Amino acid sequence: MRELVVSKIKEGTVIDHINAGKALLVLKILKIQPGTDLTVSMAMNVPSSKMGKKDIVKVEGMFIRDEELNKIALISPNATINLIRDYEIERKFKVSPPEVVEGVLKCPNHACISNAEREPITPKFYIKTEEMRATARCHYCGRKIENLDNYIS
């Protein structure tokens, strides 16, 4: 097997154990777009003994915020975050999907009150995690979402 070599970062965030194929969505959550000045390394479908395959994202000069952590936890509940300072891991932790999220997901039910323009209601969902995926249930209409990727706002 060939070895994957990606250089260390001096300061920033490494997101490891991302569900395979989700790295581009992680970049979207982090609001990293083409033309960014940040140094970004991304590896997709990397062999993993625990997951079979995984994705990895490294971002030099950016430290992840709680709002971003919650969104990443929804699409990849087993992700690991490494905060790097002076090329060393300062802090390492696993993401944990919250039990309730507000203003993070959009309800797929067009008739839901959380989608009504005339009603200033923030979408609210109850989160359930099973194995390597999370599902959500709308507080207002009860609609269950299984593929959260499409509904992250």
UniProtKB/Swiss-Prot annotation:
Top-rank lineage group of the source organism: Archaea
Q: Name one GO cellular component term.
A: aspartate carbamoyltransferase complex
The note on cofactor binding and number reads:
Binds 1 zinc ion per subunit.
- Keyword Metal-binding included in the entry's annotation: yes
The answer to keyword Zinc applying to this record is: yes
GO molecular function annotations of the record: metal ion binding
Binding-site list for Zn(2+): 107, 112, 138, 141
* GO terms (BP aspect): 'de novo' pyrimidine nucleobase biosynthetic process; pyrimidine nucleotide biosynthetic process
Q: Which cofactor does it need?
A: Zn(2+)
> What keyword terms does UniProt attach to this protein?
Metal-binding, Pyrimidine biosynthesis, Zinc
InterPro entries under this entry?
A: Asp_carbamoyltransf_reg_N (IPR020545), Asp_carbamoylTrfase_reg (IPR002801), Asp_carbamoyltrfase_reg_C (IPR020542), Asp_carbatrfase_reg_C_sf (IPR036792), Asp_carbatrfase_reg_N_sf (IPR036793)
Quaternary structure annotation from Swiss-Prot or TrEMBL: Contains catalytic and regulatory chains.
**Function in brief:** Involved in allosteric regulation of aspartate carbamoyltransferase.
NCBIfam families named among the record's database cross-references: ATCase_reg
Family membership, please give it: Belongs to the PyrI family.
Q: What is this protein called?
A: Aspartate carbamoyltransferase regulatory chain
Species of provenance: Archaeoglobus fulgidus (strain ATCC 49558 / DSM 4304 / JCM 9628 / NBRC 100126 / VC-16)
